[in-house]
Swiss-Prot record:
Chain intervals with Basic and acidic residues compositional bias: 89-106, 251-263
The protein's role, per its UniProt record: Transcription factor required for the formation of correct projections from nociceptive sensory neurons to the dorsal horn of the spinal cord and normal perception of pain.
GO molecular function: DNA binding; DNA-binding transcription factor activity; DNA-binding transcription factor activity, RNA polymerase II-specific; sequence-specific double-stranded DNA binding
Organism the protein comes from: Mus musculus
Subunit record text: Interacts with RGMB.
Family affiliation: Belongs to the paired homeobox family.
Biased composition (Pro residues): 110-123
Knockout consequences: Defects in the projection pattern of nociceptive sensory neurons to the dorsal horn of the developing spinal cord leading to reduced sensitivity to painful stimuli. They die within 3 weeks of birth. Mice lacking Drgx exhibit reduced expression of Rgmb in dorsal root ganglion sensory neurons.
Compartment(s): Nucleus
Gene3D superfamilies assigned to the protein according to its UniProt record, in alphabetical order: Homeodomain-like
Region ranges (Disordered): 88-146, 220-263
Protein name: Dorsal root ganglia homeobox protein
Amino acid sequence: MFYFHCPPQLEGTAPFGNHSTGDFDDGFLRRKQRRNRTTFTLQQLEALEAVFAQTHYPDVFTREELAMKINLTEARVQVWFQNRRAKWRKTERGASDQEPGAKEPMAEVTPPPVRNINSPPPGDQTRSKKEALEAQQSLGRTVGPTGPFFPSCLPGTLLNTATYAQALSHVASLKGGPLCSCCVPDPMGLSFLPTYGCQSNRTASVAALRMKAREHSEAVLQSANLLPSTSSSPGPASKQAPPEGSQDKTSPTKEQSEGEKSV
């Protein structure tokens, strides 16, 4: 018969080395130790919020008194206040970030005006307008007061002083009498007028200008005794026609005036 001999087991040896089971359990619990989440009741939250409304940093005596009142530990109360302050700071930061953010979309909706490259800058436009206004004022001061039939804003094509002066001298030579001073134009005062009309009188119609010219012609002919005084429209002040016997007296006056002009 065969007998199997089994060696005796080693006594006093641990299966995992020399570490005991108690030491292993204590180390495992230390590594895995976690704080439990505290669930606050409605009464506890109301008491905590009331103290937080008074002060965000309660001292240790206030925390201990509050902990005894709501049946919590002082450590739990301190952690709650830390979390509550962090939440309050986050809320304040979010509110401050939303205020400038509300104005940014308005800036995006209204883009800045686009200026044409060929157009002059705003400063040059203002300067040019000011210069044009000063030139117009200086022109009005240079021209001075004008007669009723010599408006300074007539175009150059309608206001030809040389032609008008020749027509008046021709009428005077036909009749042999001098014209009144109001009908004699001043070529020197109107010769420098521009060939364009004023900005304010561009709406004047050609018919109105023709009517004024016709009235003026009638007034001139009336002063020269070529037409009877039956004009319906009022004309410039003119002298009465001298009698037939006084024509001989007026001719020396004309000869004297022509002699003075020739000198």
